[in-house]
Amino acid sequence: MIFLLLLLVVPVSLAAVESPVSTLKIHYYRYGDDYQTGWNIWLWPLAGAGGQVDFDKNENVLVKDDWGVVATVDLTEAKFTNISQIGIIFRRGAWAEKDIDFDRFIQIPETVEGGTLHVYFVEGDEKMGYSTTDPNGPDRSDKIKSAFFTKANEIAYRLTASLAASDLSLYEDGTLLSTTITATNNTGKIVLAKDMDFSKKYQLKAQFSSGLKTYDVTFDGIYDSEAFEQAFGYDGNDLGAIVNNSSTNFRLWAPISSSVTLNIYDTGTPASLGGSDTKASTYTMIKDVKGTWKYSSNQNLHGKYYTYTITNGARTFETIDPYAKSAGVNGIRGMIVDFAQTNPDGFTYNHRPDNIVNATDAIIYELHVRDLTAHSSWNGPAEHRGKFLGLIDEGTTYEDVTTGFDHIKELGITHVQLLPFFDFGVVDESKLNDPKYQANGIFNWGYMPLNFNVPEGSYSSNPYDGTKRVTELKQVTDAFTKNDIGLIMDVVYNHTGLSADSNFNLIIPGYFHRLTPTGAFSNGSGTGNETASERYMVRKFMVDSTVFWATEYNISGFRFDLMALHDVETMNAIVTALKAIDENILIYGEPWNGGSTPLSPSIAADKVNLEDMPNVGAFNDEIRDGIKGSVFTAAEGGFVQGGTLPKIINRTKYGIVGGVAFPGLDLTDISYQTAWHTAPTKTINYVSAHDNNTLYDKLKLSTTYAQKQYIDEMQKQANAIVLTSQGVPFLHAGVEFMRSKPAVSGGYDHNSYESPDSVNQLRWDLKAEEINMSVFNYYKGLIALRKAHPAFRMATAQEVIDNVDFVYEDKQGIIAYTISNYANNDTWGTILVIHNNGNFLQLKLPEGEEGWNLVANGTKIGEETIKTYLGGGIISVLEHETLILYQGYKPLPTKRGCFGGTSIIPLAILGLGVLVLKKRKH
């Protein structure tokens, strides 16, 4: 009998043995039982791609247990094998709302009882539990969900359960206040007998049946008030760590914090990454004016690393300074920088290329740091591949064809716009030498900002040493300047890479971001949050940051990502600050956003309000889609594919005249049916950029079988239109030799933001192919021609209206125009540009006593005349060909002379024409 009992016991004991984790059970509790309103889970393996996980259902009915709903995850799937952490976010719909805004990670042990790991979550609670009785787990009892001032004497609150007004009480620095409370179900408002005092702490207490709960009242609802700005709007220029010869001064804006401690480290590397968490010293900071905290050291602390430990209410946390100017690995700790000790030899402040008078003189080339040098055919030093220093290596070739920096110089552009090179935090800088990570994970466009004023560590030779990234980036700007190329910075102030756990939000919750009426992060960026540029200290940060980059690194321009999420006043403030440094600094951006936003349309820095920003340019999606077709429909063609619809023609013409209100131009198909750019200096004309398909891939996807033989001609014509248009031309790196982005899974990659180098790299071996070299030489000639002839670079709407005329408008498939009157002091009297998108045809040239000199056709372009035609003569135009002719010639003076405030100096630009340069003010 005893033996039989033992047999019965054995299976039970065996079942309790731990086994490898194969299943994850996620238990989730919501107070309102509103799971059916679209709640789901976003789950991802650490450093891997995420995906939606739905809660379990049985015959379309949600499965519930004693805790709440349940989601089952199979951890034997390939993406979850051999991982130690899984990221988790509870969300409603496709990011309509998030429960807990920051990322949390489930720790996956190697084994667990029964092979199934259970994890428990509660709405609004940051904690997670690994059992229902886990002492470190979440609390399911009722609580206060939110309480914040909406006026100086009024608080709005939300509870998990209904309470009577008598169950609520408000305290000011521990003293009970006299209030009037109006309760409606689980929400209500509290009216104070007097206005609140920003220097005091307010706490709401609620007596639930499960016990007394407290909540620190926040200022979220009055951040936009004049009273808050007057109390805490700091206008000093000393935020961050400022190093002098024998001292270092720290100042942090943290107006609601009760204490701030400065932590000094000898290393920027935490123990988790092989460094140390031992603090060399800590200092209690002193609360000072306008919500700032300060500490002064009598030492030059250059090379040390620092963080702040901040207490807000019941929460204490350590974070990096938003004003940090360099950092250790992965941007976790800021670095104290004495820039006098990091400048490369010969570096000179306020030294930029003096290569433009007006924005229309610029030719912008958009490039990613890694793309230039990632492929083996670059043939530069291996240690510089994908790094800042690789951008400026000279003498690199592939089969006698220039690569890298020499290619850029040979092309002849005036400015390079680099995709984000601030510290974007997505790339794990501790894994840069891991071959697996190099193959899949090391690449990112960089649009998820971590530290706005810190150069990206993965682009430096040593991300563990914060001085390297500073010195090496300055070497880049210095080398560019010496080669007469301005460096434009792609800036992403419209959102932060992290939301609730970003350093901005940890320091002052809810201030730097716009929130929805429910208190969630608004998502106008499409990345989880958006910043509130209209607030005083956010605006100040943006101005301070751009001024810092312009002055410390000699940046020549700024491209604003999703600029419509910013407000007009902030953009104009940035312009004022930057133009005071150098009047030729370029400022432009994307006049759209990435989702719905609470920002008032009346103040958004978008197309409608561009007229209120006289020195801010904007990308011209009208000409982009007119030339090649919509970026949102791969198969849709535009002008170069043979399109003749009025909207195609008119959108292309709109770009040709530089986005101005040109007489006779039909604006029906232009945004808001208006010439919204207002001036050619504000019109960034382009056909392709890092977003969407490359031009070559778009042409492959949008042409018929019969048309594919003309793709190289279309590739040339697309930017022949851009480079002969009024406005500011913008080229995507590699477009000049038919760059493609072949997707890993086949086809073409239209969104390669985290695709591997194999997708994004510039293939110099392909440039060397004959057909691609012919396209490259054509682009090089176009650029030289534009630089030599100011008629293509008029700066005002009136100049364009006075000198440009469209011709051959009765000819289908033709867009043609003349630029007359020796426009903008050109040497050519009248220039005729003809774009033919269809079949071979013949045209009668305009009459005139002087002949027409053909200088560009589908294969040749330059200053030398290919053929001369009589006025009124017949000219043949091939399929998908652009012709450029001129009539009349007037040489410019060969001696320096003053003409309208400019110096006219003949220059040999690849053997072409002259360039009009303005003397820099000293």
Predicted regions: what they are:
Residues 668, 727, 731-744, 761, ...:
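Glycan-recognition and catalytic regions of carbohydrate-active enzymes
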Residues 302-304, 867-893:
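C-terminal beta-strand-rich structural cap/linker in extracellular carbohydrate-active enzymes
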Residues 334-341, 575-576, 580, 584-738, ...:
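Conserved alpha/beta catalytic core and glycan-binding cleft of carbohydrate-active enzymes
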Residues 370-553, 566-582, 586, 598:
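Substrate-binding/active-site clefts of carbohydrate-active enzymes
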Residues 37-47, 160-179, 258-280:
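Short, surface-exposed alpha-helix to beta-strand junction/turn motifs within ectodomains of secreted
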Residues 903-919:
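A cross-kingdom C-terminal cell-surface attachment/processing module
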Residues 16-34, 63-67, 71-151, 187, ...:
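The feature marks proteins involved in alpha-glucan
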